[in-house]
């Protein structure tokens, strides 16, 4: 392999963005900072006992990835320096880099020369290269085939630069400049404090492969280890952990939104420490990395710009504070201040972190990953994803505990102490008067005045016409909107769907229907957002983000909204808010009929740009004022297109998007709109429809109470959808794009839904426009003929003759029941034949596929392995404990027994 930084390209159903893993983690720390080889050996012993959390190939010789982070051993590297005939100076007066170079000697020499040039250009003294002693025979053939050329470098600290973070900052700049100029070299670590040894090993291979780790002179007070289990990923040398600051077990499910926001901050962020060097280190995130690597990029950026590592972790993965009545007001103000600038990186995760001085661990707010630790009387902290990784005499154990959700465990080896979570957070919460800053700058929606302005209302034919334009069906109102307004909760329905995919439907489905909600693949059962309400947050922040790298009062000048589903009164408050620091601009997403949709979207971009240049920091995208000549861009397309445009132009953290639209009325619609960039949504037509239900006597309720209950139902549904991805905050869910598109062309996805998973092609902009204008023509007949001013019953929820096709209809249900009751196989074949014929018209993707039988009959059956042999290789276990219900487990067990399997 000649490129250790190249991202794998999507191929078939594979996409590198799916790469997550479930891993084993561990650490051993001498609390007093006493360095020894025993700590190194114990850390290696921990990872060797995590074999059950480490993946390997079918031959059992190549692993998914194992690694260790240690302090730089002055004793060991002084000995190495003597062999290289160089002088390193005192401890921490030199930096050590680990490099994965291309195997090709010419490419390696070029990369080395480039790095030396960059180092000297940045004012540092390059000392020497060292080929890292390794034993290739200790690893499997697959790992050897793609093994990089592994080297270390040594760099002298300038006299004018202080030890520690100041010197590491210079090394960080050198590495970032080199990474952007080089192609194919990966740098696992470059620091004066820490070093990373890792690769594609089995857990026992790490100690054997790197001879440095066997040397008794290699001493450290810190050892952090990681074993990788690539549940749905490809192993590689580069993706093995640790990263440069963290190692990680779990998944960051909001990663798309997190990284987009972090990259957008590059346009407005400024650093009093980096100053003119800032441009050298951008972009902040390497988007070809794994979710944990991108989190590491973000933390490294904050630390190198002057933020303490524990603080950076604390605000990136905050504890659940908003609904927790047991935390102090000072801590609440602290979290509130940073929440206005940085959305949580959410998902089930256990994270260990270190900068060479402190070692810490934190769990996600739900505690969905295991982590237990011992503190011993002889001054050591031992932590791992499970107990028993190191033998400990019971009489030597001082503390035995587990890491709590949202809590931080920290060991400071410089001070020689374990820092209590409460004490640590109170320290950071007391550094600035965050409470005063919030009181003066944070604006609450409920505190804004209601302007003396009347919003347009719709009744009778005007309301009906709008409902037809935006694709409302009678059953949408009767089975969705009415129950939600009445009960304040989503109505219950049967699981599964037997109607055609949107792209195969002939009923002009809304664009929302082309997007399918994704769910966490490496997570325990979904979060119970009802019983675990304390960990959830529905608040969003509207306005420009402050400067994360510089604490100041005006950073938190944003509008806080507790429910992103807005009433028309809420929207009026925002539209006419007269608060210094806020400017609101409304941009129409309507276009003149017969104009191309692409030109209509480009016009919206121009208007958004104009508003930004005029000082706006809140944009309201509105489809009000539809008439016979004007058509609305589908709201999801408008929101996502503008959001992607702002991300590309790095304005997404400077402008907040609010949608005022008649189109959304189902929970899925709102989830998609928030997921693709809207901060808040005002579904004015859904609210007007509730008023109609009250006027018609179908809903016996006060209008405002009914609207509040409808909004509450929508919000509850969004929280439930986010919970499937292990996400607990709407702020994190916003812009996370956790959907898969089915039936949309690659051109549309790449331009307007960038980064969305889409494994089959489909409709283009012309098709989307044709669907929208067909609905518009049904309400405003261009020929001037009479139109049917009644809402259709689309037949999506219940079978209706001549409407949406259902695989389970009166005919197929009758045949299926008859076959079951009589046991008649011919009737069953009649049932399957009927379903197959219906499917050929296109219902699911599988309906479009068939077996390609060989003309000659194929391989004779007597040459094929018998079924009784094949089934012995079936696996029937669940992926994780609790992932199957009792009923599903028992049914699977019966099946296994019937197949004569153990």
Q: What are the functions of these language-model segments?
A:
Residues 2-547, 552-554, 577:
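Conserved short alpha-helical segments that host acidic/polar catalytic motifs at enzyme active sites
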Residues 63, 76, 285, 302-349, ...:
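Flexible, glycine-rich loop/tail regions that form catalytic "lids" or insertion modules at the edges
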Residues 276-285, 390-396, 654-659, 688-708, ...:
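Short beta-alpha connecting loops at secondary-structure transitions
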Residues 409, 623, 673, 729, ...:
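Conserved, mostly hydrophobic/aromatic
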Residues 633-659, 710-714:
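Alpha-helix-loop-beta-strand connector modules within alpha/beta enzyme cores
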Residues 659, 663-677:
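Catalytic cores of alpha/beta
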Residues 674-695, 752-753:
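Glycine-rich phosphate-binding active-site loops on the catalytic face of alpha/beta enzymes
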Residues 890-902:
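Positively charged, low-complexity/disordered segments
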């Amino acid at each position: 392999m000649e490129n250790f930084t190249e991202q794998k390209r999507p191929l078939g159903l594979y996409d590198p963005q799916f790469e997550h893993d479930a891993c084993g983690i561990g650490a051993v720390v001498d609390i007093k900072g006493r360095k020894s080889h025993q700590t190194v050996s114990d850390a290696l012993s921990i990872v060797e006992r995590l074999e059950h959390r480490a993946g390997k190939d079918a031959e059992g010789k190549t692993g998914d990835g194992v690694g260790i982070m240690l302090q730089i051993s002055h004793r060991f590297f002084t000995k190495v320096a003597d062999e290289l005939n160089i002088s390193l100076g005192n401890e921490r007066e030199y930096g050590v880099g680990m490099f994965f170079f291309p195997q090709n000697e010419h490419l390696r020499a070029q990369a080395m020369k480039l790095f030396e040039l960059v180092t000297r250009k940045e004012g540092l003294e390059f000392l020497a290269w060292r080929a890292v002693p390794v034993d290739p025979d200790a690893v499997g053939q697959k790992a050897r085939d793609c093994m990089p050329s592994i080297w270390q470098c040594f760099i002298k600290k300038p006299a004018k630069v202080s030890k520690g973070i100041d010197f590491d900052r210079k090394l960080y700049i050198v590495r970032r400049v080199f990474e952007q100029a080089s192609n194919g070299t990966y740098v696992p670590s470059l620091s004066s404090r820490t070093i990373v040894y890792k690769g594609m090993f089995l857990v026992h291979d790490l100690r054997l492969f790197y001879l440095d780790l066997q040397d008794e002179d290699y001493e450290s007070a810190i050892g952090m280890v990681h074993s990788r289990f690539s549940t749905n990923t490809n192993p590689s040398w580069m993706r093995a952990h640790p990263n440069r600051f963290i190692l990680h077990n779990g998944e960051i499910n909001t990663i798309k939104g997190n990284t987009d926001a972090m990259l957008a901050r590059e346009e407005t962020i400024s650093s009093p420490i980096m100053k003119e060097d800032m441009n050298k280190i951008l972009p902040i995130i390497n988007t070809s990395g794994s979710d944990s690597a991108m989190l590491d990029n973000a933390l490294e950026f904050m630390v190198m710009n002057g933020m303490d590592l524990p603080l950076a972790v604390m605000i990136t993965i905050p504890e659940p504070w908003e609904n927790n009545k047991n935390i102090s007001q000072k801590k609440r103000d602290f979290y509130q201040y940073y929440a206005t600038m940085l959305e949580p990186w959410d998902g089930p995760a256990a994270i260990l972190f270190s900068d060479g001085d402190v070692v810490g661990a934190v769990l996600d707010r739900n505690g969905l990953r295991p982590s237990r630790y011992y503190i011993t009387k002889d001054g050591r902290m031992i932590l791992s994803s499970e107990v028993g990784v190191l033998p400990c005499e019971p009489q030597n154990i001082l503390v035995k505990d587990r890491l709590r959700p949202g809590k931080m465990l920290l060991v400071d080896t410089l001070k020689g102490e374990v820092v209590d979570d409460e004490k640590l957070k109170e320290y950071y919460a007391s550094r600035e008067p965050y409470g005063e800053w919030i009181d003066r700058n944070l604006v609450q929606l409920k505190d804004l005045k209601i302007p003396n302005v009347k919003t347009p209302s719709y009744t009778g034919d005007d309301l009906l016409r709008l409902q037809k334009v935006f694709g409302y069906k009678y059953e949408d109102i009767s089975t969705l909107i009415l129950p939600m307004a009445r009960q304040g909760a989503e109505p219950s329905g049967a699981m599964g769907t037997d109607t055609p995919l949107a792209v195969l439907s002939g009923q002009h489905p809304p664009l929302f229907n082309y997007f399918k909600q994704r769910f966490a693949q490496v997570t325990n059962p979904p979060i119970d957002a009802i019983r675990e309400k304390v960990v959830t947050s529905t608040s969003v922040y509207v306005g420009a983000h402050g400067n994360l790298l510089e604490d100041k009062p005006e950073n938190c000048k944003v509008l806080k909204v507790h429910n992103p589903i807005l009433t028309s009164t809420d929207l009026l408050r925002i539209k006419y808010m007269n608060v210094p620091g806020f400017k609101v601009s409304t941009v129409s997403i309507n276009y003149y009929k017969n104009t191309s949709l692409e030109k209509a979207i480009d016009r919206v971009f121009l208007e958004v740009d104009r508003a930004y240049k005029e000082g706006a920091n809140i944009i309201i995208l509105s489809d009000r004022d539809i008439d016979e000549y004007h058509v609305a861009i589908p709201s999801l397309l408008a929101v996502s297109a503008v959001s992607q445009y702002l991300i590309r132009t790095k304005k997404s953290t400077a402008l907040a998007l609010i949608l005022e639209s008649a189109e959304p009325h189902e929970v899925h619609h709102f989830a998609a709109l928030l997921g693709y960039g809207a901060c808040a949504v005002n579904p004015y037509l859904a609210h007007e429809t509730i008023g109609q239900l009250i006027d018609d006597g179908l809903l016996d309720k006060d209008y405002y109470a009914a609207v509040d209950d409808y909004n509450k139902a929508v919000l509850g549904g969004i929280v439930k959808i986010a919970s499937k991805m292990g996400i607990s905050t709407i702020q994190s869910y916003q812009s996370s794009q956790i959907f898969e598109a089915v039936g949309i062309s690659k051109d549309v996805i790449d331009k307007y839904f960038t980064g969305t998973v889409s494994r089959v092609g489909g409709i283009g902009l012309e098709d989307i426009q044709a669907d929208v204008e067909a609905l518009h023509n049904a309400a405003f007949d261009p020929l001037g003929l009479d139109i049917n001013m009644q809402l259709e019953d689309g037949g999506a929820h219940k079978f209706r003759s001549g409407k949406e096709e259902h695989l389970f209809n009166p005919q197929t249900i009758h045949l299926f029941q008859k076959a079951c009751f009589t046991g008649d196989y011919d009737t069953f074949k009649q049932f399957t034949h009927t379903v197959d014929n219906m499917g050929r018209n296109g219902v699911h993707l599988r309906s479009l596929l068939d077996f390609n039988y060989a003309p000659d009959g194929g391989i004779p059956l007597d040459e094929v392995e018998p079924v009784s042999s094949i089934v012995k290789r079936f696996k029937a276990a669940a992926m994780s404990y609790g992932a199957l219900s009792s009923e599903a487990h028992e049914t699977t067990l019966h099946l296994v027994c019937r197949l004569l399997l153990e």
